[in-house]
């Protein structure tokens, strides 16, 4: 059996929160709002959302950014939430005593949340490099990355 080895990524960091006492369904509602957004935008969204699940997720996103800046020296302005997943954890079961010697079960669900942040500065530099060679009118003699473009000349937008 051949196993795929994970490549070491130098541009991504993660934070894992286990046994967070919250339903996985309720945590997913919050996670779906921040997936794919930038780090700063996600923090603003999490601060303003009125759900109880926002605070633990806010702490995880903040922790992942601290891991990025401390462990790998990445800038927080270039970070994007590339992967955010919520898995169901253990269910804590208790008994609540009721009248006449009876008891009702109480189920307290937990979840595991993983936040992966990725640095986009490397990709932005690569995209600028590719766009430099794809645009018409660009040549290798030009040292700066400005090329002739139909939008910059005003030819396309001047006519109505």
UniProtKB/Swiss-Prot annotation:
Gene3D superfamilies for the chain: Ribosomal protein L22/L17 (3.90.470.10)
Where does it primarily localize?
plastid
Q: Name its cellular compartments.
A: Plastid, Chloroplast
The protein's UniProt keywords, in alphabetical order, are: Chloroplast, Plastid, Ribonucleoprotein, Ribosomal protein, RNA-binding, rRNA-binding
Q: What is stated as this protein's family in its record?
A: Belongs to the universal ribosomal protein uL22 family.
Listed under GO biological process in this entry are: translation
Can you state the subunit structure given in the record? Part of the 50S ribosomal subunit.
Mind listing the GO molecular function terms for this protein?
rRNA binding; structural constituent of ribosome
> What InterPro entries does the database record attribute to this sequence?
Ribosomal_uL22, Ribosomal_uL22_bac/chlpt-type, Ribosomal_uL22_bac/org-type, Ribosomal_uL22_CS, Ribosomal_uL22_sf
Q: What does this protein do?
A: This protein binds specifically to 23S rRNA.
CDD domains recorded for this chain?
Ribosomal_L22
State the organism of origin: Draba nemorosa (Woodland whitlowgrass)
Among PANTHER family, the record links this protein to: CHLOROPLAST 50S RIBOSOMAL PROTEIN L22-RELATED, LARGE RIBOSOMAL SUBUNIT PROTEIN UL22M
What protein name applies here? Large ribosomal subunit protein uL22c
Q: Which Pfam families match?
A: Ribosomal_L22
One term under GO cellular component: large ribosomal subunit
């Amino acid at each position: 059996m051949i196993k795929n080895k994970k490549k070491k990524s130098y541009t991504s960091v993660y934070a894992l929160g286990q046994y967070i006492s919250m339903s996985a369904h309720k945590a997913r509602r919050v996670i779906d709002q921040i997936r794919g957004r930038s780090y700063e935008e996600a923090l603003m969204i999490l601060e303003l959302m009125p759900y109880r699940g926002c605070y633990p997720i806010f702490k995880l996103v903040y922790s992942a950014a601290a891991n990025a800046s401390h462990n790998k020296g990445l800038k927080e302005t270039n970070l994007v939430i590339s992967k955010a997943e919520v898995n169901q954890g253990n269910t804590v079961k208790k008994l609540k005593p009721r009248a006449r010697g009876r008891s009702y079960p109480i189920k307290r669900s937990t979840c595991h949340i993983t936040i992966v942040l990725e640095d986009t500065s490397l990709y932005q530099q690569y995209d600028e490099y590719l766009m430099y060679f794809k645009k018409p009118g660009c040549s290798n003699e030009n040292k700066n990355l400005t090329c002739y473009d139909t939008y910059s000349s005003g030819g396309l937008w001047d006519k109505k």
